[in-house]
From Swiss-Prot:
This is Histidine--tRNA ligase. It comes from the Archaea. InterPro entries: aa-tRNA-synth_II, aa-tRNA-synth_II/BPL/LPL, Anticodon-bd, Anticodon-bd_dom_sf, His-tRNA-ligase, HisRS-like_core, HisRS/HisZ, HisRS_anticodon. GO terms for cellular component: cytoplasm. It catalyses: tRNA(His) + L-histidine + ATP = L-histidyl-tRNA(His) + AMP + diphosphate + H(+). The gene is hisS. GO terms for molecular function: ATP binding; histidine-tRNA ligase activity. CDD domains: HisRS-like_core (cd00773), HisRS_anticodon (cd00859).
């Protein structure tokens, strides 16, 4: 019977895995330098965790199941809700703000296509416990720094849902949610039809459509002309000044709504070329979600980066590392094992495990593109030395083990 990998999943070859791990390590180093700590949450959670946050409609996208105890479970489709659950369960006593990051796989049952898989990896950041402009600015600047560190130039767009909601404050919450959803999907005909259906005033319709079509770096005066100098806009303006101090390149787009009810203020998205229709590589904003899971009214700001999309366009490659193969004959094999064991304290080393003859061992070293071969022969051992062969130039020399370590480690 033939068993294939499930649709929408991938196997990664050693070279691909090494590259992914390298890019991941670069990103980890960036967030660690910004003072964030890594957390890990379970691969599966109670189904309620995600239906509470996103509604019953999300079930069609989930890998959910009933466990042997009759409990409704699901593989995680995203990581913000698990982090908020973790905070409510265990992290509330910690000093604020809590600065957390994660790198985990997620699962969604959706149609696989370019840049979209049923198992995918997400790199994310959550700053919990501060609703200040400085927090928003740091999170945005960190997202920018992460993308820059992995060689991706993205088009960052910022919006603010609190500003949009000031125009909608007289409407029912369900209507506001529908409006935001239509704004997010840029379904302007549907938005106009909805506003007509509820009998919205012409001034509201005019102001809303003007606001959500405003784009550019220097549009705040126009925004103020529509909504006034409201506190939400004053706070947002402070965030923008901080971003200028961070040196972040951005533009404003008040048509960004992120499509999720829990976002409350600043929102942002980053788009990169070379990904076709799935060109968004990062998205986030400020939100109030913890209360939904039994915690207090705690402000948070965060973002997620689609790691698989990043890998499609990331130019980084792992630094080349010298590789060695220790070859020997049957009567010197035990000494070869000792040599390999010592060398592994300094660099990657392989030794024959197949009982190949001497010539076949050299051929294997050539096949795997080893940089060096160390020959452990009787004559070498009698002289207290080893033969180091450069597999590129073909040159070889007789050296002590210490000299070999010094020579190769210094390259």
């Amino acid at each position: 019977m033939s068993v294939n990998r499930p649709r929408g999943t991938r196997d990664f070859l050693p070279a691909d895995t090494a590259r992914r791990r390298y890019v991941e390590s670069v990103m980890r180093n960036v967030v660690l330098n910004w003072g964030y700590s890594e957390i890990i949450t379970p691969t599966f959670e109670h189904l309620d965790l995600f239906t509470l946050k996103s509604g019953e409609g999300i079930i069609g996208e989930l890998y959910n199941f009933t466990d042997k105890g009759g409990r409704e479970m699901t593989l995680r489709p995203e990581l913000t809700a698990p982090v908020m659950r973790f905070y409510v369960n265990e992290l509330q006593p910690f000093p604020k703000p809590l600065k957390l990051f994660y790198f985990e796989n997620c699962f969604r049952y959706e149609r696989p296509q370019k840049g979209r898989f049923r198992e995918f990896w997400q790199f994310g950041v959550e700053l919990i416990g501060s609703g200040k402009s400085d927090s928003d600015a740091e999170v945005i600047a960190l997202a920018s720094a992460l993308l820059k560190a992995v060689g991706i130039k993205g088009d960052m767009k910022l919006g603010n849902l609190a500003v949009i909601r000031t125009l909608l404050k007289g409407l029912e919450p369900e209507i506001v949610s529908n409006v935001m959803r239509l704004v997010d999907k840029k379904e302007y005909a549907g938005l106009e039809a909805l506003l007509d259906e509820i009998g919205a005033e012409e001034q509201l319709k005019s102001d809303l459509f003007r606001l959500i079509h405003l784009q550019g770096r220097y549009i705040l005066p126009e925004v103020k002309g529509i909504v006034g100098n409201i506190p939400e806009l004053v706070s947002f303006e402070k965030t923008l000044k901080l971003l200028d101090a961070y040196g972040v390149d951005y533009s404003l787009d008040f048509g960004i709504a992120r499509g999720l009810d829990y976002y409350t203020g600043m929102v942002f998205e980053v788009y990169a070329e070379g990904l076709g229709a799935q060109k968004q590589v990062c998205g986030g904003g400020s939100y109030q979600l913890i209360q939904l899971f039994g915690g207090g009214d705690v402000p948070s700001t965060g973002f997620g980066i689609g790691f698989d999309r990043i890998m499609e366009i990331c130019p980084l490659v792992p630094p080349a590392q010298k590789s060695l193969v220790v070859v020997s004959k049957p009567d010197t094999h035990l000494e070869a094992v000792k040599v390999a064991t010592e060398l592994r304290n300094y660099l990657p080393v392989q030794i024959d495990l197949m009982e190949r003859n001497f010539k076949a061992q050299l051929s294997y070293a050539n096949t795997i593109n080893a940089d060096y071969v160390i020959i452990v022969g009787e004559k070498e051992l009698e002289a207290g030395k080893l033969t180091l062969r450069d597999m590129v130039s073909g040159e070889q020399e007789l050296l002590t083990l210490e000299e070999i370590i010094e020579k190769i480690s210094g390259q």
